[in-house]
Every structure is written in structure tokens, then in C-alpha cells.
Amino acid sequence: MDKKTKGSECESLVSEYLQREGHTILERNYRCPFGEIDILSLSSDGVLCVTEVKSLTRRWAADEVRYMVDGRKMMRLKKTLEHYLASGSKFRYNSIRFDVATVTDAHVTYYRGEF
């Protein structure tokens, strides 16, 4: 399986997980000149969630997850979100959170507020 197909399958698993948790999926693979957001969702309590999806060959310890997204990637995600919000999104949210979801052997682990 190529990297693009694997990534798409992992993002589908995470999207399904988020929907079961009460999220509304707003965008998948939102792209702009600044970068890409894997999944943008709105939680049932009004939190706008930017989720970076990582496919792993092994499970990581919870304290290792924060190292999966470096400073450059964080900046690109924030600029991409700013671009999305400036483009006229028509939904209301209470706050914004940046999360990481890992997928190992079709198992989703979701880390809230990792960066």
C-alpha cells in the first residue's frame, strides 16, 4: 500500500472515531498556500479541533506524542487555520484546540491539546 492510500485510510479511521465521539467533520485535507490540515472538526461542546493524523508502526508513549509535530509544522497548521477562518467559515465555536491522532494497526489513539 502506498503512503497516500495509507494516509487516507488512517484519516478515515480518525474521522469515524471523531464522529462517534460527537464531532462534526468540517473538512478533511484542507489545503491552502500555507499547508494542510488533516481533519478539522467541531466537538459537541463547541471546540474547533485541528487534528494532525500520524500513521505509526508502533505505539508511542503519551509523553512522546508531543514530539511528533515540530515547531515548523505547528506554525504551518496555525497559518492554515487562520486562512480557513478568514475564508468565511459559517460556524460558531467556543475555543480552538490542536490535537494529534495516531493510528497503529487500525487502532486510533487520540491526544487532545498536544500543541
Predicted features and spans:
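Acidic active-site catalytic centers that drive phospho-/nucleotidyl reactions
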Residues: 11, 36-38, 52-54, 99
